[in-house]
Amino acid sequence: MNDPRDIIFRTDPSGEIDGISRRRFLSLLSASAALALGSSCSRIDRGTIVPYTRRPGEIIPGVAAYYASTFQEGLATQGVLVKTREGRPIHIEGNTEHASSRGKAGLRAMGDLLGLYDPDRLRAPVHKGAPCTWDDAEKAMIRTLSAARLQDKPVLLMTGAIVSPTQKALIDDLKRSLPDLRHAAWEPNAPQSEISASSALFGSALVPRLRLDKADVIVSLQSDFLGTDANAPVFIGDFAARRAISKPTDVMNRLWVCEGSMTLTGSNADQRIQVRPSRMAALAFALARLLNESHSLPLPPGLKPEELEPFAIEPVSKSLGIDASMLRLLAADLGRARKSSLVLVGSSLPPEAHLACHLLNNMLGAERNTVDLNSALPAPELLTFADLRDIFSEAAQGKFAAGIFWDSNPAYAFPDRSLWKSAVTKIPETFRIGLYEDETALDCAWRLPEHHWLEAWGDFESASDYISLRQPAIGAIHDTRQAEDFLVSCMRQMKIQDSRNYLEYLKFRWLLNVYPQGSPVPFETFWSAAVHDGGVINETEGPAPLVMNMDAIRSALTASAKTNLESLSGEMELVLYPGAGVYDGRYANNGWLNELPDPVTKATWCNPAMLSTADAERLALKDEDLVEISNGNKTVEAPVIIQPGQAPGVVGLALGYGRLTGNVAVGIGTNAYPLIDASSSSPYLLDGIKIRRKENGERRAIPRRQIHDSMEGHNQIRSWTVEELSKKTADKQDGREKHEMSSLIPKLKFPERKWSMVIDLSACVGCSACVIACQSENNIPVVGPERVLTGREMQWIRIDRYYHGDPRDPSVLLQPMLCQHCDNAPCEIVCPVNATTHSPDGLNQMIYNRCVGTRYCSNNCPFKVRRFNFFDYTSMKKEPESLVYNPEVTVRPRGVMEKCTFCIQRIENVKQKARVEGRQIEDGEIQTACSAACPAGAIVFGNLNDAQSRVAELSKSNRSYRLLEELGIQPSVTYLADVSNPAKEESKA
């Protein structure tokens, strides 16, 4: 090896860099330095420039264009802005003009950008394994539907949740022509218990708007509203608005969490109580009785106090295994806050718990404040697992002429695969319309590729008075079609409707139902404005006054009293919850979302079973032991992770893993859906499960982003109570040490600007939206589970999570960690080729073509935030995946170090714009990817030299501190101490 370049540029760029001895390295060091200083570019980084022959008028080369659109996930929608360059989407952020999501976009909305360019997408129609055309598919669909209409034989149309008024109208039009059409809308992660309880109580299923920003006291009963909930971005924003304490008069909310399986919401609790999920309804009814007896809160008309007799606080506390004084303290908090309180229940709990929640919110008066029933949306009609089982039983008897499976994958998520197989084989003609050749597609004759949502048109009821619009940000990449467009074309040829395509159908429906009749504004102008803004206000009448059916409450009381009397046995409960990244499995082929650490366990690329310390000791289990989890005769395997804060007798397991198709998804985790009991009213909560270690003692490694959970007495995360905060000043903080460090190196000066960041740990909930936004913005590669296991992950931001206190019931502290852009940076002084330097405006910058990969900088970084490219990850990508790259950010080759840049490309874009317009940069105008994505508003970026900037003001807060100040490294990132608001005995007053 004579040429030092060969160390970095090998014949096989995807291979790992060979080890090199210290002697060999030193002999090549001078040559390496000469190479770095004498080369202006890397020969790996070459490309071909292909100009437009005729440039589209709306595209300005080098200038980003933004399109307002809408992301849907189950029953939830989020307004987004799609950033495009030269006609291709490269980044997604929240749309601040969207009335429902209010500028908040979730990590899965941002991460699904990668799904647009997924090389595993179905690229053209297939019929029985052979390529075909869309004309062939249309003829087959028309022939099938026409024959079914003549034979009066039903057709099964299976979809996901329909929250689009135009989609619903399209299906209704099809039903009018095909009276026997069976529309089965089903979501594998639907809030079945919540819908069932609402229907029983009010006579119709409603989805109320929850106003966490108005709540002084929030009680969560196994509800992960800050984590895996599809509406989490909005909830986080509202919750965090009451957590950031900027002045003494601010009133901080208090979060009580009662749960059995540890969640991100539980990690943010001010008070946390471990309760078995099956007993949560009894706890809620006990609180109702206590509020009525001790705090004079009236019961709703028709319900008598004696009906709550079985739920006296002492026996209920004893049966739950918790201290009665904690429940009294909780009741006192609720009694004090009254209408400024809010009780939430998780979708995994049975309907009885949801009915108890409605009772509590009614007694507290929350239904006139924090529970906005006037803005409630009717829940879409959704089938339960039991309903779907009945339909498949009919199909297995040959009762359907055809099956159309659109945006639904029952072959994967329906628990009884044998019944599904029997059903699908007895349906004469089957069509799968979807993104992938997934499990359901493999069982269907026709596999029809659908547009990704970024290629499609659509509309959605995001709120009772707001309709969102979706528009394509790019033309179809493959030979795909929007499912609605395919159906519209077939229906036109069958003389069912007259529109030529779905866009025409959509505009016609808006002309009839949304456009204000008699408006002086032409419809096309109205439509263009709605498309531009991403939606439109649509004034509608609020729901009729709701009357609670007390019989539903009484039934819940009877069932809960019976459960409460049963003693806690040695059998265990299993809580199934959607994966933080993969959700219900729809994103399982997405590398960004698979490599995103679970916010609680920090596991990636798998779904370990969370066990309590007590259960692990009882079963003689250790981390990574492989266990069998059985529910009756159904068994799955998963590795164990011993989770601090997990309630004894409760196991947590994420859904969405164990897929059978997709190059990324196959072999990742275990499919937990087969454990579900289709007949249960709470399918995601399983009683009486068995856990045992594999007989051969097999173990399975868990790729974890963090394996050390303790701060070991250090104070990198400072946490105070509200009471303690009142005694703090900026120069009098516990553990704060100021050192005047003498140095031979002159102190850096930044006469014009000094870019800095402030992170509010009190507002940050650890949702990881910043991690995905950074990965999307900065072309950060996916490394895979094997590399995560060896500590070679590439994400520039991580969320550190630490436990303190009793490991069986700890408190949790969270801290985003990224390059601190130190003024006296330890990484800069050890780089032999000057590849990492300081910019005139305070940025610790990387010059990639100088870097020769010594990794000295990484060794000398006290924050461990630098990442080294051990591989040439770009060469591993398949087309069209490389289209996701942001052209404003260099794609780094193998052998190069990288880290957070404070989004220098965004800084330069704003500087250039301000220079052209002849003005100064405004405070807040520059948003890094992480600060723009943070739904909590916990990250603030700006010019520290501007005394009026938010960054400068927050840096002077009595909560402000910088990490490792005693080293004299002068970080540019300031943290605001975490503030908690635990309940006190005075709350009883």
Label every model-predicted segment.
Residues L264, Y436-R470, E793-M794, I799, ...:
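Flexible glycine/proline-rich, aromatic-decorated loop/lid segments
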Residues G398, Y412-E455, A614, L619:
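Hydrophobic alpha/beta core scaffold segments
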